[in-house]
């Protein structure tokens, strides 16, 4: 008996004495120190009774609760966090969250909610986080969140959303983060987003939206972080799609864009982090990021990058991290950068790198550059295939990392005379180590490369082809072969003569005769002499006619007399002059 009493006393001493634990509901675990009640995975179908009034955190996740009714939580005025994730809640009645003035976190992820009735979140003035993801929401009605003035983070991803009304986000003056993912939205309403003046981060993931319109984000002046991920229908980022934003972080990943959105990026001078990974981008043209003077991180991993043109990263004066891993790059030249002195972390692993002089700048910095634990390795030449750049001995540098300047073979002068409409070719075969790239410069000082599209193109071997030649194509063409070791040039000339007969492109056959008159000194002198002789002949012919006509009139009297009598004038002077009539003798020639 004494032994039994002793064991009973010991058992009583071991019982919890905390006041919160004394009022703990059945099938729940309570903690007095943190004022937490944990009732997760208990197969509960309703809010349990007997929850201590001083509870701060209530965890009811992964149960079978179907509905929240008014008054279910009214006895918990000090509640700060409520977790109702992964139940089967289909209805939340207005007033269900009444008398919860201190509630800061409300989690309703993974339920069966299809609609949020007006007034459900009334009086939740302290709520800062609301998670409604993984439900069955189809539409967000006007003023669904108007009473949540303190809300900072809203999660509504993984729903069946097809429409967000214009005033759905009205009242969310303090919202800082919004996530929309795995919805059926096909467009973004600038009017609905325009109510989120204080929004700082917007995450848009797994959406079937095909285009970013110019006005999508114009009313979000405070947005600093924009994430666009898994938009398989997005093929282009319009130049004005980011207008009005002052982003510091931009991520556009797992889309179908095939080019760097350089025009849209020019307006983002405050950008410090840019992620364009996992897009089918095959080339980075020259100057693609020239206006991003504050950029510190650039990610282009897992794309289809095969070519990065010289000066592609010009303007990136503060670049610290560059991630080009898992692409198709054979090299990365130093002249690609504005300056490599600021670079701290470089990821070029997962590329078929050719270990030659173009990578010498990386090898020389292999002890100070951070490769983030992913060491790049050589794919060629065969002697060092699979060797990590970081582990190459210095003796290898003089054997494999040496360039040979390009040299153009067959330097015989090419002069081609073609008729308008003909196709012509100019050869330019160059050799060097590494293999040089060939470009041509036209008489109009335009550069023609292998990537050019038009009548003039450069074939893989360096040959220039000009289709459908025209007279304005005439002139001197310059071939420029270049690699990391230098360049070599070669000249060719083309003369295009106009065609005599030309078929117009409108479907009507018209014959145009083009006659060329070569103008030289002999032609001018002969033409002048012929003109003078013709003029003099005409003059002589006229004199001859006059002579013959005058002879045909017969003999004429050449002399004749004219008698003239002065008129009488009164006065003395007149009297003295009276002497009769005077005669004049004249001869006609």
From Swiss-Prot:
Source taxon at top rank: Eukaryota
Signal peptide feature range: 1-23
Disulfide cysteine pairs (residue numbers): 428-479
Protein topology in the membrane: Single-pass type I membrane protein
Keyword Membrane part of the UniProt annotation: yes
Ig-like C2-type domain span: 406-495
Cross-referenced SMART domains: IG, IGc2, LRR_TYP, LRRCT, LRRNT
Transmembrane segments: 529-549
Residue positions the entry lists as glycosylated: 184, 246, 256, 275, 323, 487, 501, 509
Chief location bin: membrane
Regions of this protein lying in the Extracellular compartment: 24-528
InterPro entries xrefs: Cys-rich_flank_reg_C, Ig-like_dom, Ig-like_dom_sf, Ig-like_fold, Ig_I-set, Ig_sub, Ig_sub2, Leu-rich_rpt
UniProtKB keywords: Disulfide bond, Glycoprotein, Immunoglobulin domain, Leucine-rich repeat, Membrane, Repeat, Signal, Transmembrane, Transmembrane helix
Cytoplasmic-facing ranges: 550-589
LRRNT domain boundaries: 24-53
Coiled coil: none
One GO CC term on file: membrane
Name of protein: Leucine-rich repeat and immunoglobulin-like domain-containing nogo receptor-interacting protein 3
Species for this entry: Mus musculus
